[in-house]
């Protein structure tokens, strides 16, 4: 089957996997406020049942993320993403057909397996096929796709919530939640068939000693099909050298991850994904309807929808400018602003709020309200929007870009799967415990998440160096330089040096890679490989 080699198309289409992640995030938020969902599943007060339903998908995603590297390393990144789409289709069918909480939970766990695999392997595939000049841009497309998935699913649910007289009609049909859960099958089907058009990652091919194929793919991705293009040969040579070094070190698999030079990067990637959850964004996504209800918003579903639009729109600037301004500034600015907005939001909730008198049955899911202070309610809504905007332009894109690019090729899939698993562990815990926390400690929860953002800012300032402008094979130099994280490694690009030598005729790369030898043979007056 004929393959497509346009990097932007490949990276953009692959983010349908991120879109499924977005469908997951808002797969509950739009139905929580409907009578059909509440009456059919009998979630009740206290929210432990709802927390269990919500966290089923993050739990499945955790399992999927942990398994993703085994599938991706053995069968390729492309086949791993394709397999994930099958899980999504099966899980969505179960959700759509659910006749009670048990089948709904099973469906969400299976669909979650898809999201775990896709969320780990889509950024890896993007990082391995994109040139360094646009790597941040194309990987951040993953976050944009997530926001589109959130937005599209939410508005599908918002439209379906008006079936049979609207969300407050006690006799509302179950179509209010079955239609949205059924429609989400469609992108899974598109992703499955679309992946047949994708070439395998050249770095994965090289790791399997399929060097001729790797060179052909590189040439079509970055050299318009010319296997002798200097940029293609330089990248090919750099991959050779990196794999040779890794093989000399002999260790493979997870034991390689505990070596000090790699382990610190594993912890960094896992930490960034952890902080991206503990910053509070997914609370805004999963349970925004409850937050809007506590402010006395006239139409919580409609008011909540604005933040989904902002989330999608404000991710676009990050895609455009991430490769210009860098990852580190985005991370630090993001956590700083998010902390400020949450401290203010928690202060307003605590200073002007009061226990919910439960005079309105539609508001039984919340225990704290500022409805008696309309101006304060509007300020809280505005702060929620500002929080979402700051996340969308900073932490959202970088939390996927940064972990996908900081590891050596030999352990990249495994390390990214652990980083993504960290995301899903905390996602699962938050989905389970936030509803009872909102119920029991209400406004204090905002202060807890604000403190997490403060801690994240300090941690990332001390440990996260800039990665903009380096090839994947140069990340070892960045992290092994001995420089503090706030100082950027100043050095010439190894790939640019190789490209220059090739152009000048001082370095010759033999396109046909013979056997498994990857070392350079020096001759005078030229170098030959």
Swiss-Prot record:
One function term, GO molecular function aspect: carbohydrate:proton symporter activity
Top-level taxon: Eukaryota
Its job: Probable MFS glucose transporter; part of the gene cluster 27 that mediates the biosynthesis of asparasone A, a sclerotium-specific anthraquinone pigment important for sclerotial survival.
Disulfide bonds: none
Localization (cell): Membrane
Gene name per UniProt: mfs1
The keyword Cell wall biogenesis/degradation is annotated on this UniProt entry: no
UniProt-listed InterPro entries: MFS_dom (IPR020846), MFS_sugar_transport-like (IPR005828), MFS_Sugar_Transporters (IPR050360), MFS_trans_sf (IPR036259), Sugar/inositol_transpt (IPR003663), Sugar_transporter_CS (IPR005829)
Entry keywords, A to Z: Membrane, Sugar transport, Transmembrane, Transmembrane helix, Transport
Record's note on what induces expression: Expression is induced by the developmental and secondary metabolism regulator veA.
Leader sequence segment: none
Gene Ontology CC: membrane
Chain ranges passing through the membrane: 7-27, 52-72, 86-106, 109-129, 138-158, 179-199, 272-292, 301-321, 330-350, 375-395, 415-439, 446-464
Family: Belongs to the major facilitator superfamily. Sugar transporter (TC 2.A.1.1) family.
A UniProt-annotated Pfam family: Sugar_tr
Membrane topology: Multi-pass membrane protein
Primary subcellular site in the record, as a coarse category: membrane
Keyword Transmembrane: yes
Annotated protein name in UniProt: MFS glucose transporter mfs1
